Amino acid sequence: MSFNPLNNLYDSLQNVINDNQNDITKFVEGNNSAGTRVRKAMQAVKSLAQEVRVEVQEQKNKKF
């Protein structure tokens, strides 16, 4: 299987989400600092999601 940057982007996206599970729980339990970390992580998710969208579009356009 050849290298595909989409795999790395998707793995990064999953890692950001998985790494912040504890902070989400802490925020629900009342830790406001954890909420700040969650918001920061969600900005990273937004950015990575956009990169995934762009890469998918680029790969789709290369096929046609």
Model region roles, listed by residue range:
Residues M1-D23:
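N-terminal acidic leader/helix
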Residues F3, D11-Q14, V38, A49, ...:
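Metal-centered catalytic cores of metalloenzymes
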Residues I17, Q21-I24, K46-A49, R53-V56:
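A structural signal for well-ordered alpha-helices, especially hydrophobic packing surfaces
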Residues G35-Q43:
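Short, charged, amphipathic alpha-helical segments
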